[in-house]
Amino acid sequence: QYDFDEVIERRGTGALKYEALLPRWGRDDLIPLWVADMDFRTPPFIMEAIRRRCEHEILGYTVKPRPFFEAIRDWVDRRHGWKVNASEIGFAPGIVPGISSAIQCFTEPGDKIMIQPPVYHPFAMIIRENGREIVNNPLILENGRYRMDFNHMKEAVRGCRMFILCNPHNPGGRVWSPEELRRVAEICTANGTLVVSDEIHADLTLPGHRHTVFATVSEQARMNSVTYMAPSKTFNVPGLGSSYVICQNPDLFAKYQDFVSGRELAEGHVFAYDGLISAYSGPEGEEWLAQALDYIQENIRFIDAELRRRMPKIKAIMPDASYLVFLDCR
């Protein structure tokens, strides 16, 4: 039904991964593999929702409509079995801005924040930019898969006010198991360390694997976490700037909402809501995603086979989730 083979020219449209090639690397004829967005056409049902909104011809100030919350509530229930209330959902202009807000809201300058390298590099960037201290709990690469080092974590987490979890992991592709996540919850709760879980790649969990939302693994996890999600990676719409935060601890969520509201970060632009609602509501989004995941999985298999045939010394870290394939070139 959808043509994922179609090649669309993105140069000249302000696309980050193409337009930044020349100023960053001095040439623009490179294949950009440094930004995590797909080159698939934006799904037609999302484009149609945006066109309908444009037909009104007044792009004024916009409040979050009730269907925005309902669409998120129903989506995370259908996709991940996570029961949430609309009152536990908030808007975020992006995952990184959202996590940066959490850092500012729940920690103080000089506080320690733990991350698990190799991991999405903006985590370290926003910790430093907010004047906090990075504490590393490195993952262990074992038999082509990353695993957490819990013995090291128990020591590293001491004195940390926050742990930024990448679930599923970027770039390692791990879908963390419920058992692993429960251990994280136990260790962090025992040390008074808030877990901020970046779950933007959750919907891109590949066939044969199942994503587990951190907040669902235990009461400790539910009450000691803030979760960020978005349709941006799922449906290739990062330019919409439509992400969201879910927190089921009323006190934490009230503090966070007061913080972002006071900095005018709690509202989105006119297309952010309609884009998300169209992606998450109705069967079109589910069907598009199912077809996209099948296509992505075949691409990953192709990469692995070609590396084995052409460059056998380079090992692909085969992902459980996402379209990112981390290559071990050592």
Question: Model-predicted segments: where are they?
Answer:
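N-terminal small-domain helix-loop-helix segment of the aminotransferase-like
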Residues: 2-94, 101, 279-282
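Structural signature of PLP-dependent enzymes
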Residues: 254-261, 280-304
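Helix-loop "lid/cap" segments that line or gate small-molecule binding pockets
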Residues: 72, 240-248, 273-283
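Conserved PLP-binding active-site segment of the aspartate aminotransferase-like
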Residues: 34, 248, 324-330
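Active-site PLP attachment segment
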Residues: 217-255
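Conserved core of the PLP fold type I
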Residues: 59-186, 203-204, 211-216, 220, ...
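Walker B catalytic acidic pair
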Residues: 199
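Conserved glycine-rich beta-strand-loop-beta hairpin in the small C-terminal domain of fold type I
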Residues: 277, 294-304, 315-329
